[in-house]
């Protein structure tokens, strides 16, 4: 079984076209790409509503609505003229085999990073971030984590494959440094003694964006950063199509402004996860995810253009 694919060898979940109508490249390791997009159609680790395996397809589908804008507002340049971005399709694995997915995703990421590429990944449920962190830590060493979510995902329930345990496991494996990591938008129960800085949704909504970004920069410092965005960080009014929605979240406007504010960080890997299109309304969740992913690429392009 191949590692990467498209709708003809993985017809349940993938697309024939790339994110933002970018070129598809199923051999990205030898390409001249700066950033490689990988879909991870996996939702076996979810504790809420299933369907996140269809997230990558939904994000790609709605991203066609974003492809027409060249000098994107408010950046006033075209990201595609500064970054070489390709979409390598979806990870292909035996559906029902969480271990195979994890091992194949980590191996794929390690191969890309060794070839000098950077990764933007689409989940799938949030568990997919753990094998990505393992690969990135092998390449970059211990990292800071900037994590947007309604949940901290630091729960120790003893389950090997669970979308609520990754950031309990990752510090224990030495992948991330919680003392240089920040979790944004949290509005569920969390452990206050694990080293992470938690900026709950209430204070994120009440404080100024510049104030929050200044604090994030101070916490992270100059460490390599992994950026992960669980779409349930947004209020369900803006992102109903997700497995574990929680009211009282961020607006899409505030989330975009916060992501733009991360431009000066040393971001080495990124993902957007937990889009479950079966529960979406008029594709607004997928559109929010696609827009946030595009903004992530724009902050990389902005740095390259400086």
UniProtKB/Swiss-Prot annotation:
Gene Ontology BP, a term: spermidine biosynthetic process
Keyword Metal-binding among record annotations: yes
EC number(s) from the headed UniProt entry: 3.5.3.11
PROSITE patterns the UniProt entry points to: ARGINASE_1, ARGINASE_2
EC class name: hydrolase
Keyword check for Metal-binding: yes
Sorted UniProt keywords: Hydrolase, Manganese, Metal-binding, Polyamine biosynthesis, Putrescine biosynthesis, Spermidine biosynthesis
Family recorded in the similarity comment: Belongs to the arginase family. Agmatinase subfamily.
Example GO molecular function: manganese ion binding
Protein name: Agmatinase
Function summary: Catalyzes the formation of putrescine from agmatine.
Coiled coil: none
The protein's annotated pathway: Amine and polyamine biosynthesis; putrescine biosynthesis via agmatine pathway; putrescine from agmatine: step 1/1
UniProt xrefs under HAMAP family: SpeB (MF_01418)
UniProt cross-references to InterPro entries, sorted A to Z: Agmatinase, Agmatinase-rel, Ureohydrolase, Ureohydrolase_dom_sf, Ureohydrolase_Mn_BS
Pfam families membership: Arginase (PF00491)
Cofactor: Mn(2+)
Cited Gene3D superfamilies: Ureohydrolase domain
UniProt superkingdom: Bacteria
Catalytic activity as recorded in UniProt: agmatine + H2O = urea + putrescine
Residues that hold Mn(2+) according to the record: 126, 149, 151, 153, 230, 232
């Amino acid at each position: 079984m191949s590692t990467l694919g498209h709708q003809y060898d993985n017809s349940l979940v993938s697309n024939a076209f790339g994110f933002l109508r970018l070129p598809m490249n199923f051999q990205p390791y030898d390409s001249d790409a700066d950033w490689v997009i990988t879909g991870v159609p996996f939702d076996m680790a979810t504790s809420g509503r299933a369907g996140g395996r269809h997230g990558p397809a939904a994000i790609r589908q709605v991203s066609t609505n974003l492809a027409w804008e060249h000098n994107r507002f408010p950046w006033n340049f075209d990201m595609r003229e500064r970054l070489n971005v390709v979409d390598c399709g979806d990870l292909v694995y035996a559906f029902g085999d969480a271990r195979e997915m994890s091992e194949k995703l980590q191996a794929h990421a390690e191969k890309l990073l060794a070839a000098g590429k950077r990764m933007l990944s689409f989940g799938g449920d949030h568990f997919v971030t753990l094998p990505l962190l393992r690969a990135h830590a092998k390449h970059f060493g211990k990292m800071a984590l900037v994590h947007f979510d309604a949940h901290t995902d630091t729960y120790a329930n003893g389950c090997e494959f669970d979308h609520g345990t990754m950031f309990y496991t990752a510090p224990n494996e030495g992948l991330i440094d919680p003392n240089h990591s920040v979790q944004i938008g949290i509005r569920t129960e969390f452990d206050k003694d694990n080293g992470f800085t938690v900026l709950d949704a209430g204070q994120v909504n009440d404080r100024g964006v510049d104030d929050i970004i200044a604090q994030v920069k101070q916490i992270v410092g100059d460490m390599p950063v992994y950026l992960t965005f669980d779409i349930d960080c947004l209020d369900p009014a803006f992102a109903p199509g997700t497995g574990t929605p929680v009211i009282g979240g961020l607006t899409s406007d505030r989330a975009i402004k916060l992501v733009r504010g991360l431009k000066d960080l040393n971001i080495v890997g990124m993902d957007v996860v937990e889009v479950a299109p079966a529960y979406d309304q008029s594709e607004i969740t997928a559109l929010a995810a696609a827009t946030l992913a595009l903004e992530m690429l724009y902050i990389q392009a902005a740095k390259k253009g400086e």
